[in-house]
Swiss-Prot record:
GO biological process, one term: proton motive force-driven plasma membrane ATP synthesis
Subcellular location: Cell inner membrane
Family annotation (InterPro entries): ATP_synth_F1_ATPase_gsu, ATP_synth_F1_gsu
Bilayer disposition of the protein: Peripheral membrane protein
KW rRNA processing (keyword) present: no
Source organism (scientific name): Nitratidesulfovibrio vulgaris (strain DSM 19637 / Miyazaki F) (Desulfovibrio vulgaris)
Keywords: ATP synthesis, Cell inner membrane, Cell membrane, CF(1), Hydrogen ion transport, Ion transport, Membrane, Transport
Protein name, as recorded: ATP synthase gamma chain
PANTHER family recorded: ATP SYNTHASE GAMMA CHAIN (PTHR11693), ATP SYNTHASE SUBUNIT GAMMA, MITOCHONDRIAL (PTHR11693:SF22)
Record's keyword annotation contains Disulfide bond: no
Function: Produces ATP from ADP in the presence of a proton gradient across the membrane. The gamma chain is believed to be important in regulating ATPase activity and the flow of protons through the CF(0) complex.
One GO CC annotation: plasma membrane
MF terms (GO), sorted A to Z: ATP binding; proton-transporting ATP synthase activity, rotational mechanism
Family annotation (Pfam families): ATP-synt (PF00231)
Length: 293
């Protein structure tokens, strides 16, 4: 049985850990509220943008703009992998990395070259351990970012696609469904799919007839690159919110585990102290009996 001092030290250590996990839970909760507000503000714009651009693209031939062109032979696949920069968020990062690596393995098995575009340290570190090229590795970005981050990634993948260095682009990110549910999603980014095939957020059914001026071709040249960046930004926002929700849940579970451990150690402490008292009493009684004899 451990000594009383050892048990006291363990209890003090667990209490300090509990303070840390509780503080991290509160920080994650505050950051999650901010991330949710950003998503709620952005989603209506994104939904209308998807609806309008999908209608616009359906009126044009795929040969009008190279971003609409579906290539007959896919030689190189670009995977944009969005993860967090830090851990302590349960299985959040491992789920995203597993999804991306499975996708990369599938593409490689089909004879395609794979390039990773990583945002977040966890995804970057995992991608560097593979045999695939890491064309972009951005770290310390997910804590605080704006549309410029999506713009930077978008310009890279668009230029690579137009230069035929990439033939398709897929984004792997964490979709924020609820506080308790975050899903790893593999979303095709390029080539841009027609409206009926689009893997975009569902928008309310609309019977609006759009009138486009000037010509459709000119509008597509301006709007298609922005559409790519909007998709990337939405994925980054979802990943950020999912990270904070996952960390909040992980820290809540850790705090509960600390409470359970403190309870068990306190019980052990009481048992150890009681055993010590019993031994002392037995020694006293034994000594008294010896004196009588």
């Amino acid at each position: 049985m451990p000594s009383l001092k050892d048990v006291k030290v363990k209890i003090a250590g667990v209490k300090k850990t509990k303070q840390i996990t509780k503080a991290m839970n509160m920080v994650a909760s505050a950051k999650l509220r901010g991330a949710q507000q950003r998503i709620e503000r952005f989603r209506p714009y994104a939904a209308k943008f998807y609806d309008m651009l999908g209608d616009l693209a359906s009126k044009a031939d795929s040969s009008v703009h190279p971003l609409l062109e579906v290539r007959e032979e896919i030689k190189t696949c670009g995977i944009v992998l969005a993860t967090s920069d830090r851990g302590l968020c349960g299985s959040f990062n491992s789920n995203l990395i597993t999804t991306a690596l499975k996708l990369a393995a599938k593409k490689a098995a089909e004879g395609k070259k794979v390039k990773f575009y990583c945002v977040g340290k966890k995804g970057r570190d995992a991608a560097r351990k593979t045999d695939h090229e890491v064309a972009m590795a951005l770290a310390d970005q997910m804590g605080s970012f704006d549309f410029q981050l999506a713009n930077r990634i978008g310009l890279d993948v668009i230029n690579a696609y137009l230069a035929r260095e990439l033939d398709e682009v897929i984004m792997v990110y964490g979709e924020f469904v609820s506080m308790a549910k975050q899903l790893p999603i593999a979303l095709p980014i390029l080539p841009i799919a027609p409206k009926e095939e689009e893997a975009a957020p569902a928008a309310p059914a609309s019977n609006k007839e759009y009138i486009y001026e000037p010509a459709v071709e000119g509008l597509l040249a301006e709007l298609l690159p922005r559409f790519i960046k909007v998709q990337l930004y939405r994925g980054l926002l979802d990943t950020s919110a999912s990270e904070h929700a996952a960390r909040m849940a992980a820290m809540d579970n850790a705090t509960r585990s600390c409470d359970d451990m403190i309870g068990s150690l306190t019980l052990l402490f009481n048992k150890t102290r009681q055993a010590s008292i019993t031994r002392d009493l037995m020694d006293i009684v034994g000594g008294a009996e010896a004196l009588k004899g």
